[in-house]
Amino acid sequence: MQGFFWKTWLVLAVCGTPASLAHRPLSYGEALELAVSVYNGKAGEASLYRLLEAVPQPEWDPSSEGSQQLNFTLKETACQVEEERSLEECGFQEDGVVLECTGYYFFGETPPVVVLSCVPVGGVEEEEEEEEEEQKAEAENDEEVEKEKGDEEKDQPKRVKRFKKFFKKVKKSVKKRLKKIFKKPMVIGVTIPF
């Protein structure tokens, strides 16, 4: 009789498990709130970001077991992360950073996974314009410096001149690469505990 009791409990537990493993339906609004919360919690930024705009997703299926995508824009607020204030209390910074974000929800995974990718608005175009302006400014500056140092360098050997040119190129290359490293898109992936 005891064996039958435990077998019954085991069958009930196995039958009840799939229902508890399925994710709870997530509306589009809840998915956006969760994405903003994940970004603020994992991005390592000093300021909190708030939803500025969301692209409507009419094909969003709250009970989907597959992957779903959402697109939205975040803007930097005046609140700091360590203040732990509600986002509704935080106003946007006048010159705050604006981020274009794409979120991917993978509900077929156990537990569900969200991956966010955020890029500063106008990042590539502005970066190219800044590089061109910097190159022009550096070229003008180099010409002025060359004119001033022209008399001094006449006395220097060719080897010293070559080293100076080489190190200028290295310095420019390092600056350029550092700018690219720090302007890469932020990608965050987390599991969602339901």
Curated annotation (Swiss-Prot):
Removed propeptide positions: 23-164
SS bonds (residue pairs): 79-90, 101-118
Principal subcellular localisation of the protein: secreted
Residue stretches of biased makeup (Acidic residues): 125-145
Signal peptide: 1-22
One term under GO cellular component: other organism cell membrane
Cellular localization per UniProt: Secreted; Target cell membrane
UniProtKB keywords: Antibiotic, Antimicrobial, Cleavage on pair of basic residues, Disulfide bond, Fungicide, Membrane, Pharmaceutical, Secreted, Signal, Target cell membrane, Target membrane
GO terms for biological process, alphabetical: defense response to bacterium; defense response to fungus; killing of cells of another organism
Tissue-wise expression: Expressed by the venom gland.
Keyword Secreted: yes
Pfam families in UniProt: Cathelicidins (PF00666)
InterPro entries: Cathelicidin-like (IPR001894), Cystatin_sf (IPR046350)
Function, as annotated: Potent antimicrobial peptide against Gram-negative (P.aeruginosa, K.pneumoniae, E.coli, A.baumannii). Shows moderate activities against Gram-positive bacteria (E.faecalis, S.aureus, S.pyogenes). Also shows antifungal activity against standard and clinical isolates of yeasts (MIC=10-40 uM) and dermatophytes (MIC=1-5 uM). Adopts an amphipathic alpha helical conformation, that may allow to partition into the target membrane. Shows high toxicity towards human fibroblasts (micromolar ranges). Shows low hemolytic activities on human erythrocytes.
Something else known: The putative mature sequence has been predicted by AMPA, a predictive algorithm for identification of peptide stretches with antimicrobial properties.
PANTHER family in alphabetical order: CATHELICIDIN, NEUTROPHILIC GRANULE PROTEIN
Family recorded in the similarity comment: Belongs to the cathelicidin family.
Name of the protein in its database record: Crotalicidin
